[in-house]
A protein has these predicted regions:
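Hydrophobic alpha-helical transmembrane segments of multi-pass integral membrane proteins
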Residues: 1-152
Length: 152
């Protein structure tokens, strides 16, 4: 005998596509994926940089190792944490939906692509990928804030 949980009163049925796009809990709120990838970056970047400074490894990338470390800790790690916080906070402040599912996943992939570009791409590509996330997130947050009508 199988039991099923009845749907919540007044709940609309969920389309299969929506379940696929929004069903993975990590992609339901902005802080979840961004905090995870930021923590992974810190766990990889700090030991790698220390190893490079001690001469144990040679880093071949678009920028010098000292600049890369400073840049990734400030504009990689910190930006990931701040973007995750703000996407979640704007939803809490306004009650309106911020990116989730595939849209949130695309923002995370863009952040990851910028981190990998330091190693795999020429400097101009690295620079463009690194710069483009913040304006995109700013526009997303501005649209949600304006739609909410909150004047504070």
């Amino acid at each position: 005998m199988t039991r099923s949980i009845p749907p919540a009163v007044g709940a609309a049925p969920v389309a299969p596509a929506e379940t696929f796009l929004y069903g993975w809990p990590v992609l339901r709120l902005g802080f979840r994926p961004f905090y995870i990838v930021s923590a992974v970056l810190a766990c990889i970047a700090v030991p790698l940089w220390v190893a490079a400074m001690l001469g144990a490894v040679t880093l071949n990338m678009a920028v010098q190792p000292m600049l890369w470390h400073a840049h990734e800790m400030l504009l990689g790690f910190a930006t990931g944490v701040i973007v995750g916080f703000l996407l979640t906070a704007v939803k809490a402040w306004t009650g309106l939906q911020t990116p989730r599912g595939a849209a949130l996943g695309a923002l995370v992939v863009l952040w990851i692509a910028a981190r990998l570009a330091a190693w795999l791409a020429p400097y101009p590509v690295y620079a463009v990928l690194d710069v483009v996330l913040l304006p995109i997130v700013s526009v997303i947050m501005l649209r949600v804030l304006l739609r909410s009508g909150n004047k504070r």
